[in-house]
Every structure is written in C-alpha cells, then in structure tokens.
Amino acid sequence: MDTKTFTKKYYVDRKNTDCIKWDDKAAKGKLPMFIADMDFKTEDKINAALASRIKHGSYGYTFLPEDYYDTLNAWNKKRNNITYKKEAIRFSKGAVDAIIQIIHALTKEKDAILITTPVYPPFFGSVKTTKRTLVTSSLIRTNGLYTFNYEDIEKKFKEKKVKVLILCSPHNPLGRVWTKKELDKLFALTHKYHVLVISDEVHSDIIMSGHKFIPSLSFKKYENEIITITALSKTFSLAIFAHCHIVIPNKKLRDKFDKYQNEYHLASVNAFCAYPSYYGYKYGEEWLDSLNKVVEENYCYLCLRLGKYVDILPLEGTYLAFVDFKGYTKNAYKFLYEKCDLMATAGEKFDAKCATWARLNLATSLANVKKACDAIEKELKK
C-alpha cells in the first residue's frame, strides 16, 4: 500500500476521545508531536477480531490462544530471524513495568545500574524508584551517528561494580538501530564484567529501509546474560492494551523472576490485552510495512524542509526524530511551544544536557508534518 492510500485509510482524528496526545490541556491550540503513539487506526483485521470478541459479551477468566507462541515466533522468525522458547517467555503490562520487576527480582538495593544517555526518561525513574544506584555513560557522536563510549562503559563497570545495563534497542530518542558489531562489542564487556543486560526492544518493528534490527538474544554466546522485552504497543499503537513479553533464557534467572512474580501475584497474563498482539502477529505485516514507509517519507520531508537550519539526527528506527535547535534557542521545547504552536518532547527529559534538542513524533500524516515544518521554518528564518 502506498503512503497516500495508507494515510487516507488509516489516519484518524483523535480529538475529543480522551487522547493524551490531542486532548491534553497543554496541547490545546498546539500541534501535538510529543508522546510516542500514532495518529493511525490499527490494522482492520485486528479491529475486526477485537470487535468479534467484544460481541460475544462474556469477559470471564480465559487463557491465551493455543497457537499464541507459534504466532509470535513466526513473526519474529520472518522479520528478525529469531525464535524464543515458550518456557522462556513471561509477561508484564509494559516495558517499564517489566524493567522494574526484573530489577526487584534479580538485584539488591543500592546495586549499580548503568544506562547510556540521552535515553527514554523512565529508565532513570526505574533505577531511582527501586532504590538502586544510577550510573550513566554518555553516548558519543562519531561521523554523525551516536554510539557507545566503550572505554567509559568499561571504566564504569569496573569502578562502580555495575550489576545491570539497561539497553534501548532501537534507541529512543536517537533513532539508532545498533549494528551487530556495536552490540557484539558491548556484550563482550557485559560478559567480561558479569553485567546483566535488560534489552528494551519495543520499537524493533519500526525500522527504516537500509537498516536491519539485531535482536540482543541473537547473540547465542551471551543469551544467558540477557533479558529481552518485546511488545507490539508501538508497532500497532496498542498502548492501552497493557501487554509485553519478557524473554529470560537463563533458567536460574527465570526461577528467581518467577518467585518474585508469584510472590506479588504478577504472573498472570491479561488474555484480553494479549489478543490485539496475537491478531497483530497474524494479520499486521502489510499494514506495518506501509506504516514504515509513511514514517520514512515524513522524515525525509522534515530533513528537506529543516535540514539546512537545524541538526536532525539520522533516523534508522522508531518513528521519533531528534532535532537540535542550537543557535536558535537555549530551550527547544519552549521555542516550539511558544513560537511555533507545536508541542514536542523536551530534550532535557532524555538528558539534562539536551535542552536545545526536541523529539518529534512522525507517526502522523504528512500534512501534519508539513504544518509543523511551515511553523518552524517561519521562526527559523526570522
């Protein structure tokens, strides 16, 4: 499906639906390009299957469809050449919830946890709320791309006695899809220093042409030291259906995690929330391929219009563009909000040093991207 046809068929006006993105009081009168969800309806067959379940009218206790795991693995095998053993998969209501559960189950208070910055803000909170010790390592820019500062990471591993690394793959907000070489070098360090990796891969289906997502658990030699979190919440805009997978190949770690989940009654899966993912894995591939084309088209347009003024990071994955307005303002969020009537995500949320940066959500219509570019360019020309 071409981008125009997709947008015409699936773009939806979300105003007055209790939508955080469009109905937030702060977004009134502004073009919202902040929170990471889409302005597109999910795939028709997913909606139809859900409607059929609702029409039945009974919402008693149930379990997952018999072929749920086979359907999940068929998707993963086709798109990323990986499958996960059924016994290794656990569930949670979301990536952040999963990270917090893993930290509670497998570490102790004051244990050091490293995150690479700038990064998705809840990573910071997940360390602080669990009373662990936050350690950060700044990503470094080389030839226009941000990558890991391996020397600094190794230094922190040694000096801070780091127990866990939380990895964002693909990276939010930098849009990186880590290469096999980058990940192999990183995991060699985590292996050397006995650091557990929690790999948040919820954006892994949103990949631009010319790039290939590498699942962390595809490195078989390190799989016992890695826990992966996957979901279709970003893929098909299913955020209200709180459902994600936690893949734990290491049985000793899995047993500890199971003990924690069982102790706090967290082990059950909400089957109704799992259904949209199940239907997405079965029916959503063509829809997703079209969506990725829309995101890429929007990104190319953004670069064409604004690239001569501001620093726009290359977008390899996710539908989130990270833009530096340095030279025009000291605070990109305020500049966009007050001058351009546009609500973005403030760069300093990802790192205190990123106040001149803003994250823009491109999972919307090209018309909205054009409107945003018109407003921004008008101010940049002044």
Residue ranges: model-predicted function:
Residues 2-94, 101, 382:
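N-terminal small-domain helix-loop-helix segment of the aminotransferase-like
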Residues 48-52, 224-296, 304, 378-380:
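Conserved core segment of the aminotransferase class I/II
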Residues 59-188, 205-206, 211-219, 223, ...:
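Conserved core of the PLP fold type I
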Residues 155, 331, 335-344, 350-382:
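PLP-dependent enzyme catalytic core of the Aspartate aminotransferase-like
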Residues 201:
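Walker B catalytic acidic pair
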Residues 247, 322-324, 361-363:
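Short hydrophobic/aromatic beta-strand micro-patches
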Residues 274, 278, 294-303, 312-325, ...:
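Conserved glycine-rich beta-strand-loop-beta hairpin in the small C-terminal domain of fold type I
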